[in-house]
Amino acid sequence: MKSSEVRQKFLEFFETHGHTIVPSSPLVPGNDPTLLFTNAGMVQFKDVFLGQDKRPYVRAASAQRCVRAGGKHNDLENVGYTARHHTFFEMLGNFSFGDYFKRNAIRFAWEFLTDILKIPRERLWITVYAEDDEAADIWLNEVGIDSSRFTRIATQDNFWQMGDTGPCGPCSEIFYDHGPEIPGGPPGTPNADGDRYVEIWNLVFMQYNRDSAGTLHPLPRPSVDTGMGLERISAVMQQVHSNYEIDLFQQLIKAAARATNTTDLSSSSLNVIADHIRACSFLIADGVIPGNEGRGYVLRRIIRRAIRHGYKLGQKQPFFHQLVEDLASVMGQAYPELMEAKTRVSAVLKQEEERFAETLENGMQVLEAALRRGDRMLDGETLFRLYDTFGFPLDLTADIARERGIAIDEAGFDQAMEQQRERARTTSKFIMQEAIAYSGPSTTFHGYESLRQEGQVLAIYKEGSRVEFIEAGDEAVIVLDKTPFYAESGGQVGDSGELLAANGTFAVADTQKIQADVFGHKGLLRSGRLATGDAVLAEVDRAARARTERNHSVTHLMHKALREVLGHHVQQKGSLVDANKTRFDFAHNQPVTDAEIRKVEMLVNAEILANAATEARMMAIEDAKKSGAMMLFGEKYSDEVRVLDIGTSRELCGGTHVKRTGDIGLFKIVAESGVAAGVRRVEAVTGERALTYIQEQELQLQRVAAAVKAQPQDAAARITQILDNVKHLERELGRMKSKLASSQGDDFADRVREIKGVKVLAVCLEEADPKTLREAVDKFKNKFKSCVTVLAAVEDGKVKLIAGVTSDLTARLKAGDLVNFVAQQVGGKGGGRADLAQAGGTVPDSLPAALESVASWVEQHL
């Protein structure tokens, strides 16, 4: 039975038993920014199990795409070498949300395995949690399992929990016996780690809630979460022991063998490549881009591991991306999203392959040299050099070292990494340069409601040290109890403005966070005196704040528009919002086209014209997730978050924003560029700056049109016409120069010398460029058949030299040696092939003597 048939039979079986078939969720969890990847079928139902979400169904079944690589579930080093380790797998699962419980869950599983798949009962072994008498009774007395194939397990292997607190409960696991020819004992025995008995289905019964004291309380509506690996059950149905022997993998292994020109289909490297193309393709299809952090770095590690195994098989050219088409033919019917994204997936993989190819060869040479030293451990310095200089992820180097029986100094690598981070920290710009150790009350921010706020000076810092007062001309950092000044956060720069006291005026140039809830106002006391305890009127620069708010609000609209135009793989990678512009970095693997930029501009300006009201609300993080607010992976959010609705955008944001989208005025993208592999950057302006930019562009167009004597709308066509004329004239000029050089060559016939039967010519041609010199050399070589030629030209005080030697003489005379000999006399150097070489120089006055010396050089070398 094919894997696709097993998947289909599973879904059909549970659909006939009242389950709603729910499509696989993306590999990037949408409801949990703290989770790296979707690693189980229950992830998309987590909020339902926690009681934070309610679905229109109480029974569900799915075939869920999963990735386990990085973090807790890191099987990467074993993938390809064992029978059942994978980075990507499919989990078949059925779920009950307060509907059926143990009895039906067990009966469904048993019926599917024995009646639908026809697996012999005597091949199945059952385990339950030691204290779960209810499940034991159902298995033994209702299903009728032979007690000799039944085990109670007292360890946590048979007790599942979501975390230290929350829903939890006992498990019942179903194992398949692959037969006595495979080593290993039954579950629960000392030999259980063998491969004979393989877990194929886990039934989790969520019946308790564990409180902070560790006490278990019965849940009012117990639920069921089950998971069965498609690859494992397919191996059972196809009567093979290794997952890599099933039909799905065999097709990919054969494709990998074709792409790497490999004939040995049992190679572990082919297993690695076949596994990794699944993980990489689906991750990219779901919006992950190779990068240097988070999900992007896990993806990059997997890609580079696959490339390295191709290299090991002898494939030095990009090959991995070719397998996307093969994967689509295998899994595209079950997952149409892969078919839709396959062109983009292939392009991303090819780009990453080409990027790594630039350093792989050199990195392997460094690694091979280190491994040949014979040390039992590869040192941390080499590990870090391979990582930092050649892009070798640590686990890739560890893989290669392990194949040679050599350990790695991971602690030394970590130390080298920390030293680099420390260097980066000390050399990076940090606006609040003084090390301020503040202890005291926090700052209350009032800047959402008002730009003027009365407050009191809590502390003053001068050159990093706390002082009681400052005087006119002093630079300092002021801490207030209440402030309207926004402190730099979330990409938005800090506010500027003034602190007005009875005895002085303090100009605030920037506002930074000293601590999470303590704001430092950095600036200069322009006049008077300011002391701790003084009352001040804090007033933000209204014009600068307004421009910053426009730019911040438009960033949200632009982010949404970019996702709409380019795809949902677009994810924010960084931003900078100030009074002049917004700069936005995002995941995307190719330049944004002019047409795409225009679409983004149209969408954003349409939102501005709609003049929709902006609404900010505080809500619980779980409510924010359910509302669909965009969150950033890796960000740490508090239990209560600020959700901003602006136009059709909804994001978590603590920044300051316009009241209505119309306040933005106008939006214009002014630059687009790449900042790293898979990361693009756009810069945009708003309001009067957008208008000024457009007017400047219009003025430039008018000037260009005037210069080419055309109307602005005809300028492009006129310039194209002029450029075509220039190209025509350049070709004519080239022909004239060739003709001139040819005629000069004829004039120099009397300058040809004969030395030991070899014709030698060394002359300077007037008005000749390098192309003309080469043509003239070829002409002389064709004319004299056996000759040595050195031709020179002088332009703008620079000497150009070309030397030619006919093929019958190159065993004795090298053009590269000759041209270098001449070039050294005119202040230059050069080189090239034995038959043709070129050089340059900076001393044209020495050229006549240098050319005169050619004859003697040839005579010496013949």
Curated annotation (Swiss-Prot):
TM segment ranges: none
GO molecular function: alanine-tRNA ligase activity; aminoacyl-tRNA deacylase activity; ATP binding; tRNA binding; zinc ion binding
EC number: 6.1.1.7
Single Gene Ontology BP annotation: negative regulation of DNA-templated transcription
Cofactor note as given: Binds 1 zinc ion per subunit.
Top enzyme class: ligase
Keyword Ligase: yes
Catalytic activity: tRNA(Ala) + L-alanine + ATP = L-alanyl-tRNA(Ala) + AMP + diphosphate
Domain notes: Consists of three domains; the N-terminal catalytic domain, the editing domain and the C-terminal C-Ala domain. The editing domain removes incorrectly charged amino acids, while the C-Ala domain, along with tRNA(Ala), serves as a bridge to cooperatively bring together the editing and aminoacylation centers thus stimulating deacylation of misacylated tRNAs.
Protein's job: Catalyzes the attachment of alanine to tRNA(Ala) in a two-step reaction: alanine is first activated by ATP to form Ala-AMP and then transferred to the acceptor end of tRNA(Ala). Also edits incorrectly charged Ser-tRNA(Ala) and Gly-tRNA(Ala) via its editing domain.
Matches recorded under PANTHER family: ALANINE--TRNA LIGASE, CYTOPLASMIC (PTHR11777:SF9), ALANYL-TRNA SYNTHETASE (PTHR11777)
Name by which UniProt lists this protein: Alanine--tRNA ligase
